[in-house]
Amino acid sequence: MNDRADFVVPDITTRKNVGLSHDANDFTLPQPLDRYSAEDHATWATLYQRQCKLLPGRACDEFMEGLERLEVDADRVPDFNKLNQKLMAATGWKIVAVPGLIPDDVFFEHLANRRFPVTWWLREPHQLDYLQEPDVFHDLFGHVPLLINPVFADYLEAYGKGGVKAKALGALPMLARLYWYTVEFGLINTPAGMRIYGAGILSSKSESIYCLDSASPNRVGFDLMRIMNTRYRIDTFQKTYFVIDSFKQLFDATAPDFAPLYLQLADAQPWGAGDVAPDDLVLNAGDRQGWADTEDV
């Protein structure tokens, strides 16, 4: 999701999409399978194998089950059409290829109709450990396996429908924070301990370790209003992770009309990314070691 008012297409997106065209309305395009080089497939295999070695015991069971049920290719960039056969049969979702970041209204419309936009291109070998823009590994490996879980699938559809309303109400920054702290960087309590479900973590080797093992970040119980009023970081590891108890809790929290909540928060001073609020359910208070002093989003 892009929550910037000044939507700008990153240079790498422009370069990767030379010679391709997308639909002017929904930004989709046929997945250009012939564009993937042997180097691309090798890069995918490296990323996939690295995360699959690391994530057992760290990722939530629902993610690992989804990865297995979808039979995501380990040695090459997957064919979206083949994945869609299994995904649509499970929850009615499908993935659609897009050139990169897309405008918010288009993004919300896709989610509201059970279509998940996946950037078609892959990062380059020197970008294995960091890429600011989402690529096919982040979008597909990180996000798509959980779409086979019916409760999470319903949550993401509801989020898309809420996004259309939020944009009309000028409340997009609040809803963007909810996406960031759940879909991208969420943790979940399980009987076996705290686990990862956020795609931004699941697709990152270093943050998969940091979010659970480091003493630096705060880990705080899920609170909808708190999250929608909390800034975040896009350039470093997160200072705070919000922890849900179940995907049902996440879905139930988004069921009410958000319009009154937006009004309540309209004049509220947002919490900083590393702040601990008086009413927080603090599971782990971070020691703040290594935190960058630059501004939050």
From Swiss-Prot:
Entry keyword 4Fe-4S: no
Pfam families linked to this entry: Biopterin_H
Task: List the InterPro entries.
Answer: ArAA_hydroxylase, ArAA_hydroxylase_Fe/CU_BS, ArAA_hydroxylase_sf, Aro-AA_hydroxylase_C_sf, Aromatic-AA_hydroxylase_C, Phe-4-hydroxylase_mono
Known catalysed reaction(s)? (6R)-L-erythro-5,6,7,8-tetrahydrobiopterin + L-phenylalanine + O2 = (4aS,6R)-4a-hydroxy-L-erythro-5,6,7,8-tetrahydrobiopterin + L-tyrosine
Q: Which domain of life is it from?
A: Bacteria
Which CDD domains is this protein grouped with? Answer: pro_PheOH
The UniProt entry's GO biological process terms, in alphabetical order, are: L-phenylalanine catabolic process
Which Gene Ontology terms cover its molecular function? iron ion binding; phenylalanine 4-monooxygenase activity
Subunit structure as annotated in this protein's UniProt entry: Monomer.
- Protein name in UniProt: Phenylalanine-4-hydroxylase
Source organism per UniProt: Chromobacterium violaceum (strain ATCC 12472 / DSM 30191 / JCM 1249 / CCUG 213 / NBRC 12614 / NCIMB 9131 / NCTC 9757 / MK)
Encoded by which gene? phhA
